[in-house]
Amino acid sequence: MTLQPTPADRFTFGLWTVGWTGADPFGVATRPALDPVEAVHKLSELGAYGITFHDNDLVPFDATASERELILKNFKAALAETGLKTPMVTTNLFSHPVFKDGGFTSNDRSVRRFALSKVLQNIDLAAELGAETFVMWGGREGSEYDGSKDLSAALDRMKEGVDTAAAYIKDKGYGLRIALEPKPNEPRGDIFLPTVGHGLAFIAQLEHGDIVGLNPETGHEQMAGLNFTHGIAQALWAGKLFHIDLNGQRGIKYDQDLVFGHGDLTSAFFTVDLLENGFPNGGPKYDGPRHFDYKPSRTDGYDGVWESAKSNMSMYLLLKERALAFRADPDVQEALKTSGVFELGEPTLAAGETTADLLADASAFAEFDADAAAQRSFAFVRLNQLAIEHLLGAR
C-alpha cells in the first residue's frame, strides 16, 4: 500500500489548522498569517481532497464588501486551478468579543439575532462553494456559573437556532446537512451539548432533525474521558455521523489537537478500523471526508506545518493498511468467532418469537445453567493482542 495520499482518500484540512499562527492564551503568534490561496495550492500538492473553513478564516470579520468579493474571487480561482473541494463550511461564533456569552444562546437577544443572520449568510456561501456539510461548533455556547443561564431557555434557543438554519437550507433547496460538533469545555467552563450522546438526544428534539447530525472530534470526546470509537459507532448506528474530525489527544486535559495518531494510538487504530472496515457484522458505513482538525506545533515554521499535514495523512494510511490486514487475518476471524463477536450479531429473540414464547422456553431460564455459562472464556485479551501485533507491524 502506498503512503502517498491522493484525492481518492478524501483527506481534508481546516484552513484554521495549517493556517494556525501559533498564538495561544500564553503567547503571541510564532508564524506569520497564511494566505488562503497558498494553503489551497499547498494542500493540493500534498494530495489532499479538500479544504474547509470558518467564514472568518477566509474573510475577516470587518472586511468591506469589496474586500470580501476579491478574497472570494481569488479563493474560488485557486480551487478551480487545483481541483481542491470545499466539502464543509462552518461559522465563527466564538472569536469576536460580541460572542463572549455565546451566539445562539447569548443572554443578549440582539446578539442571538446577529449570530443567526451570520449563520444564514454563511450557509449561502457554503452552498455556493458546493459544500455538503455545514458544521456548527458552539464553543461559546455555555457558562462558567450555573446561575448565569436558564438552562431550559438556553436549549430552547439552541433548538430555535439550529431548526431555523435547517429550515432555511430546505427552503433554499440547498444540498446541505448540518453537523453539530460536541465538546465538553474550552473555551467555556461548560459547553452545551458536550458529548456525542448529548448531541444525539438534542437532535431527537428538533423539528428538522432529519438533516441534522454530528461531527465528533477525537480529542473532544477523549477530553471527557470517553471512548471516541464508541462515540462515532453510536452516531453511525443512529445514521447521524455526517462528518468527522480526526486529531490526537493524550488523556483528560486541554484540547491538544495533536496530529492524528500522535495521541492514543490504539484508539486511532480502532477508529480507522471502524471507518474503513465497518462493523464486524455489517451495518452502516461512513463514506464522508477524513477531516483533520489539529494544530501544527507552534515550535515550527511553515516547513514544519506542511510536514505535520503530511503526517496526518501518512498516519491514517498506515493505520488503514494495518486495519485492513487485521480484518483479513484468518487468525483474527477465528478469534472474533471465539470471542462471540459474530454471535453478538444474532438477534436474541428468534424470528417471530414473542415474549410469551421466550417465557415458555425452559432452556432460556428454568433449565439454563448459569454456573456452566459463567465458565465460558471469551479470550478478549487474545483478540486485542492480535490487534496490537497488526498495529505494530508484527503480523
From Swiss-Prot:
Chain coiled-coil ranges: none
PROSITE patterns in the cross-refs: XYLOSE_ISOMERASE
Top enzyme class: isomerase
Residues noted as binding Mg(2+) 1 in the record, renumbered to the chain: 181, 217, 245, 293
Cofactor: Mg(2+)
Active site: 54, 57
Enzyme nomenclature, EC number: 5.3.1.5
Gene Ontology molecular function, alphabetical: magnesium ion binding; xylose isomerase activity
Binding site for Mg(2+) 2: 217, 220, 255, 257
SUPFAM superfamilies documented for this protein: Xylose isomerase-like
Keywords of the record: Carbohydrate metabolism, Cytoplasm, Isomerase, Magnesium, Metal-binding, Xylose metabolism
Cellular localisation: Cytoplasm
Main location: cytoplasm
Keyword NAD: no
Alphabetical GO biological process terms: D-xylose metabolic process
Cofactor note (record): Binds 2 magnesium ions per subunit.
Reactions accelerated catalytically: alpha-D-xylose = alpha-D-xylulofuranose
Family statement: Belongs to the xylose isomerase family.
PANTHER family: PTHR48408, XYLOSE ISOMERASE
Subunit structure: Homotetramer.
Annotated protein name in UniProt: Xylose isomerase
Source organism of the structure: Arthrobacter sp. (strain FB24)
